A protein has these predicted regions:
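Fe(II)/2-oxoglutarate oxygenase catalytic core
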Residues: 1-403, 409-449
Length: 449
């Protein structure tokens, strides 16, 4: 599913909405058959973790691309204040009030009031428009949205807004003693403290806050390279007999630092073969943390590793990489081919591909630190998905299907270089990735001593 909103809606419908329908009074006449059929499929349906992950993915897209929540609810991926959308799906998918409430509730449950306020505001607006009508699939109501939004504003320091929303709640449910008590407390606080309010809630600080702004700015304006007459396209053999009859198609993207894209590096059939081989083995990607490896919110993807013996297509791909780069990619000089799937809102925030600590698990391999990375796109995305080089201050957009090993000299990039030699002093710089849709890539890390 290319559209993240459609993916979220589908996961929510399968995980949450169906439960409400199957166990509703309207289904009582066919309860046994309906519930039996549902239970038979339940193990294959998305779980709560999937639904919450889809909601967090929408919030991640909201942040990285500065998207308007109101625009997202209308099915348009539009940066706040922009004149044109970043991405307009061929068939727009709108979000319901209940959808927006659920996204806001996921943020609310972890104390993230920056995101909960934006999504619950939209939920309240949409519930107000449809108040009085009832949708079988809705789990939430206007009262629920008002209640959660009021407390979000209170926790963010806006007591007067919390009071206003709580009073509105009581107009719909005047017998609710808890909310009535909240109103009394809010009124007392305003009497004691006055009407001075804190500013708007601040976005939660990430683990990579110092580079986050640069990363997101580059993702929002991908491929902004200044025209340079010296940049050109060429056919390259790199002195390899393997490339004599079918030279590599190289596009020089940047000279300082040097970055090139190789077009048509893999065929569609090869890409599908690699994805099919990796599919059954995909697991949540991990990052190095001291001597251990662990999951991290700044890397959201699934990955699998393929040996060159897995299929002739993998062996052929590695021979091609060796021919283009001039580097030995056989073990132990390179790791196995890593296939990565960036699903809904998948991304990898600023990071180094090489080890920065002597305790890294990489050193236990006794093959040296990483000196180069070849990255090949196996599929394309509808929008976004750029690779951003934050210290060099530029980004490279996804090349539609086929492949694009990247190359650059150090220390400005973490990707592979052609026709250059490296020593142990090599220090690749961080690279970042963010993808709003489903995207698969193959990566080959090369070691040096």
């Amino acid at each position: 599913v290319d559209n993240p909103l459609l993916a979220f809606g589908l996961i929510k419908r399968l995980r949450s909405d169906w439960l409400n329908v199957v166990y509703s009074e309207a289904a009582s006449e066919n309860t046994r058959e309906l519930q039996a059929g549902f239970e038979a499929l339940r193990q294959e349906l998305p779980g709560l973790e999937d639904l919450e992950g889809a909601a967090r993915a929408l919030m991640r897209l909201q942040d990285v691309y500065a998207l308007s929540v109101k625009g997202l609810a209308k099915g348009v991926f539009e940066p706040a204040g922009a004149r044109s959308p970043l991405y307009r799906p061929g068939q727009p998918v709108t979000l319901s009030a209940d959808d927006c409430f659920h996204v806001g509730k996921v943020a609310y449950d972890v104390g993230d009031y920056y995101h909960s306020i934006a999504w619950l505001e939209e939920a309240v607006d949409l519930f107000r428009l449809s108040y009085g009508s009832w949708n079988t699939e809705d789990l939430a109501s206007l009262e629920d949205a008002l209640d959660h939004l009021a407390f979000s504003y209170f926790m963010a320091g806006n007591v007067s807004h919390a009071l206003s929303l709580s009073r509105e709640f009581l107009r719909y449910d005047p017998s609710n003693l808890r909310v009535a008590k909240n109103v009394a407390q809010y009124e007392k606080l305003l009497e004691e403290q006055g009407t001075a309010e804190l500013g708007p809630p601040r976005r939660p600080d990430g683990t990579r806050l110092q580079t986050r702004d640069a990363y997101e700015e580059l993702c929002q304006r991908p491929g902004t390279q200044h025209p340079t007459p010296s940049l050109r396209c060429s056919y390259e053999t790199n002195g390899s007999p393997y490339l004599l009859l079918q030279p590599a198609k190289r596009e020089t993207v940047r000279l300082r630092p040097y970055v090139a894209l190789y077009h048509d590096f893999v065929s569609d059939a090869e890409a599908e073969t690699v994805k099919a081989l990796a599919g059954p083995w995909l697991q949540r990607s991990v990052v190095a943390s001291g001597e251990k490896q662990q999951k991290a919110e700044y890397r959201i993807s699934k990955s699998a590793w393929l040996k060159d013996t897995a299929d002739p297509a993998v062996a052929a791909l590695e021979r091609r990489i060796a021919a283009v780069t001039g580097l030995d990619v056989r073990a132990p000089y390179a790791e196995y081919l890593q296939v990565v799937n960036y699903g809904l809102g998948g991304h990898y925030e600023p990071h180094f591909d090489h080890a920065t600590s002597g305790k890294s698990p990489l050193y236990r391999m006794k093959s040296g630190n990483r000196i180069a990375t070849v990255m090949i796109y196996l599929s394309s995305v509808e929008a976004g998905g750029s690779t951003a080089f934050i210290y060099a201050n530029f980004s490279v957009p996804v090349v539609k299907v086929r492949g694009d090993p990247r190359q650059a000299p150090w220390p400005t990039s973490g990707s592979t270089s052609t026709g250059r030699s490296f020593g142990s002093h090599v220090a690749p710089g961080p690279r970042t990735e963010a993808a709003p849709g489903s995207n698969s890539a193959a990566r080959l890390q090369i070691q040096g001593k």
